[in-house]
Amino acid sequence: MQNVGFIGWRGMVGSVLMDRMVQENDFANINPIFFTTSQAGQKAPVFAGKDAGELKNAFDIEELKKLDIIVTCQGGDYTNEVYPKLKATGWNGYWIDAASALRMEKDAIIVLDPVNQHVISEGLKNGIKTFVGGNCTVSLMLMAIGGLFEKDLVEWVSVATYQAASGAGAKNMRELLSQMGELEASVKAELANPASSILEIERKVTAKMREDSFPTDNFGAPLAGSLIPWIDKLLESGQTKEEWKGYAETNKILGLSDNPIPVDGLCVRIGALRCHSQAFTIKLKK
């Protein structure tokens, strides 16, 4: 039975993964070992009745070297720190990652098996050991219109995405809820009075959003009652990195990096917890 290490299993993505693995009875076929960045030595969680002993230190390269497979949902900073150190030891196990840090590496494959199973299978034959989850909106787009790409019918795509707080992580989801709570509290009395002016309510809400004390540490701006047409950092091209991913990751997933299809658009963060939405304009070849 293979030793499989899990890092970042308590976060938003990790929690969903654990639930799914329990549903699919995946723990029956592995020896799970759980790692932590802050609570090493404490009791490990029990999934599907399997006692995994104590939590291991997620930065302990010697412990990580013992694993056949590593599944990490810890984020890009962790990957950037640990992955090169682990590979430098000669470790030759499988690294499966939800973060974006390794997506565009030459020896990594972005996994979207309903669309690029042929790329995954070829990579396994060629000894690829690093597999990375794709960008959320890129994956959704290809699940929706992947058949058009497969039939070589697409000349270009323009996409507008409307992305929930969950795409930025659990801390951002909490911040959105905190923002919602503060806005509601600021006009609680007015909302209880049907005769109160909606314009006055709106003015008070806007004033609250502009206060220095309003919680924006994670998003950098109010999201509750608003939206943010900017996700990730600015690139030299003038795109945000999230917009660039639509082009770069789409073509890598499809194995088209040498003859890429243009993909561009606008990515907007909206005040929803987990619901993403997209709108496409597609030019077809026929």
UniProtKB/Swiss-Prot annotation:
It holds the Pfam family Semialdhyde_dh. It is an enzyme of class 1 (oxidoreductase). NADP(+) binds at residues 10-13, 37-38, 74, 166-167, 194. GO terms for biological process: diaminopimelate biosynthetic process; isoleucine biosynthetic process; lysine biosynthetic process via diaminopimelate; methionine biosynthetic process; threonine biosynthetic process. Homodimer. Belongs to the aspartate-semialdehyde dehydrogenase family. This is Aspartate-semialdehyde dehydrogenase. It comes from Actinobacillus pleuropneumoniae.
